[in-house]
Amino acid sequence: ISPVHKYIKDYADAGANIITIHPEATDNLKDSINHIRSFKKKVGVSLNPDTEINTIENLLNEIDLVLVMSVFPGFGGQKFMPEIVTKIKNLKKIKEEKKLNFDIEVDGGINFENNKIVIEAGANILVSGTTIFKENNGNIKKNIDSLKLE
């Protein structure tokens, strides 16, 4: 949704713990981050496949979560874009080099074939819809457990 600024209060009032926004959905990302913080909420910033890390790099110390989209937003069931693994690795490298503390979440086409690669690249949160609800005859618990590397 855009512009995102006018909806932040609605999400905060509805009880959201983390409010994640796209840089493209705001005229001033820093102001939107501060607006989210004014409601005592965690801040997430989402990077589309074609959004570069440098778009948010100077604000990473103010972000709780970076959501790396491994498909273009719009509909479920899309194929994972393997070139996104490099972006995840680069985010992890920046996080470690600058000693920052943010989660790396990946959403889009996550399945049993790519979950390990994504986690090893640096993701600690995976979003998976189609795999969770459709694999193994819809056995949600089994599918979630299978996506974990524990």
Question: Over which residues does each language-model region extend?
Answer:
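Conserved anion-binding
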Residues: 6-7, 16-103
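C-terminal helical cap(s) of enzyme catalytic domains, especially alpha/beta-barrels
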Residues: 36, 119, 133-150
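Short Gly/Pro-enriched loop/turn and capping motifs at secondary-structure junctions
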Residues: 72-74, 109-113, 132-133
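Catalytic cores of alpha/beta
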Residues: 5-13, 51-63, 108-126
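N-terminal glycine-rich "phosphate-gripper" loop used for MgATP/nucleotide binding
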Residues: 1
